[in-house]
Design a protein with these regions (language model features):
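Short, charged helix-capping/linker segments at alpha-helix termini
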Residues: 10-11, 127-135
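Amphipathic alpha-helical packing segments from all-alpha helical-bundle domains
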Residues: 52, 82-91, 101-126, 137, ...
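Helix-turn-helix
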Residues: 2-41
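Hydrophobic alpha-helical connector segments
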Residues: 41, 55-86, 135-142, 184
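Short helix-capping/turn signature of helix-turn-helix
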Residues: 32, 78, 92-99
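Short, basic, alpha-helical segments at the C-terminal edge of helix-turn-helix-like DNA-binding modules
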Residues: 44-50
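Secondary-structure edge/capping motif, primarily at the C-terminal ends of alpha-helices
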Residues: 61, 94-98, 153-157
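C-terminal peripheral helix-coil segments that are non-catalytic and often amphipathic
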Residues: 112-124, 145, 151-188
Length: 188
């Protein structure tokens, strides 16, 4: 991941990985087989880590939809997921996904699962409370804000904090569902 973060996908080579790790290129080729296989494996690792993170957050959250949605938001900004290095690598893969079916499939499957979960929670909340937006629009808005804050975390000022991001998304959520009382804001 370090090479992708520092050099991007196109400049990441098995030779550069070997140099960075301090082993022979032959050893890297033996274990990784090809750059294509390495990149696919890296993306699957990131994808699995992210998916396991948000699924675990749901499992640990109280069962009501509002708490579960807040848990998904917090999970999107945990340090092991939301850090400059990993976001940089995610953006590199997202940028290539349109021309690489493997990347599109891996990214797309997880994105769809996350989106479906956010939408289902928004639909449940909408059915039980006053909502200023339809569930589809609310889900799209919350996800778009998370993605935008990830981009801000990567490209914005170095003073940007996870707690600020979580608070911002919670405030959007609270403005969409005004009759829900906000719980305490996480301090990640």
């Amino acid at each position: 991941m370090d090479c992708i973060d520092k050099l991007g996908l196109s400049q990441t080579t098995l030779a550069r990985i070997a140099e960075r790790v301090g082993i022979s290129q032959g050893n890297v080729v033996f274990h990784l087989h090809s750059k294509k296989a390495l990149l696919a494996q890296t993306l699957r690792h990131l994808n699995d880590e992210y998916r396991c993170n948000w699924i675990a957050a749901l499992a640990a959250a109280p069962p009501d939809a509002h708490s579960q949605l807040r848990a998904l938001i917090e999970a999107s900004f945990t340090p092991k997921i939301c850090n400059r290095r990993k976001i940089s690598v995610w953006f590199a893969f997202w940028g290539e996904s349109r021309s690489r079916p493997t990347y599109m499939r891996v990214c797309g499957d997880n994105d769809k699962a996350f989106s479906d979960q956010v939408l289902a929670l928004c639909q449940t909340i909408e059915a039980r409370s006053t909502a200023r937006l339809k569930a589809e629009t609310a889900a799209l808005s919350l996800e778009g804000m998370i993605d935008g804050l990830w981009q801000n975390f990567l490209l914005g000022s170095s003073g940007f904090k996870r707690a600020q991001a979580i608070k911002a998304v919670f405030e959007l959520m609270d403005s969409i569902y005004p009759d829900r009382k906000p719980e305490s804001v996480a301090t990640i």
